[in-house]
Regions:
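Catalytic cysteine-centered active-site loop
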Residues: 119-175
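SH3/SH3-like beta-barrel superfamily modules
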Residues: 2, 38-82
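Short, well-ordered loop/turn sites that connect or cap secondary structure elements
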Residues: 14, 41, 173-174
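...with weaker cross-activation on analogous glycine-rich loops/strands in unrelated enzymes
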Residues: 151-221
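Surface-exposed beta-loop interaction hotspot
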Residues: 84-123
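A generic structural signal for residues embedded in beta-strands
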Residues: 22, 49, 181-182
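Aromatic- and glycine-rich peptidoglycan recognition patches
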Residues: 1-10, 15-30, 35-38, 166, ...
Length: 250
């Protein structure tokens, strides 16, 4: 039986400590009014309400501000079409073999990305549901599909990963599944995943990239797109843990 989200929030006094499960795929937006997509959110993901609170709910509003459980991401979502249910968090246990679990999933993650690349796709800012992705949406979803939670945006993933090295000329220490970070001294603004043999997958835009998921090289090349991204390489990182709400600094 469908229950209006606002009536559910009222029952819990708009608590920020109650968790909710999404029953539909939805879009996440940058602010309360504009249609600036920042992410797409899978059905069955978990969130908590940040806005409105019990003193504000009488105001007319079409969006609510939420924080997602699996990555701590904050965005606005539309109330229209929203279907949710209350969710009881289970006590999480320390996963002693987490690093080995992640390592075992990397070949499957790379195969999943290759399969996505074979589909008709184009670059979509905020895309995570597929077949259209942005750079970090592709990487986050690839890991999410394999029960590994990492942050949403490329600069957040960079901080979350185990730092391997800053780029000079060598890529020989990279392993398949390592992540590559691109940008400038101020900020990382692009991400790819290393396939092996100097090659990496990434979803790149229209202006300097392939307008979708492509394979580029770190080796010497005359390809303009590979050269552009090689010039922007910052560092490499390795996913060695899964984001956990109860232990990850937010």
């Amino acid at each position: 039986i469908y229950k209006d989200p606002i009536s559910l929030f009222k029952q819990t006094n708009f608590s920020k400590t109650i968790w909710w499960k999404l029953k539909v795929n939805i879009s996440g937006y940058q602010n309360q009014t504009e249609d600036k997509l920042v992410t797409e959110i899978f059905k069955n993901r978990i969130f908590r309400l940040l806005y409105p609170n019990i003193y504000q709910y009488n105001h007319k509003f079409q969006r609510i501000l939420i924080q997602l459980y699996e990555d701590g991401y904050v965005c606005w979502i539309n109330l229209d079409g929203l279907i949710i249910e209350k969710y009881e968090l289970r006590k999480t246990e320390n996963f002693k073999n987490e690093r080995f679990f992640i390592k075992d999933q990397l070949n499957s993650i790379l195969k999943w990305i290759k399969d996505q690349a074979d589909l008709t796709n184009e670059y979509l800012w905020g895309g995570t549901l597929g077949p259209n992705y942005d750079c970090s949406g592709l990487i986050q979803t690839a890991f999410l599909k394999h029960r590994i939670f990492i942050p949403r945006d490329s600069y957040q993933i960079k901080s979350f990963c185990k730092h391997l090295f800053y780029f000079k000329d060598s890529y020989k220490a990279l392993r398949p599944g390592d992540l590559l970070f691109f940008g400038n001294k101020e900020k990382c603004d692009h991400i790819g995943i290393y396939k092996g043999d100097g090659l990496y997958f990434h979803s790149s835009g229209r202006d300097f990239g392939r307008n979708g998921i492509g394979l580029d090289t770190l080796k010497h090349s005359n390809d303009k797109i590979s050269l552009h991204y090689k010039s922007k390489l910052i560092s490499a990182g390795r996913v060695v843990r899964s984001y956990r709400w109860d232990r990850t600094i937010r």
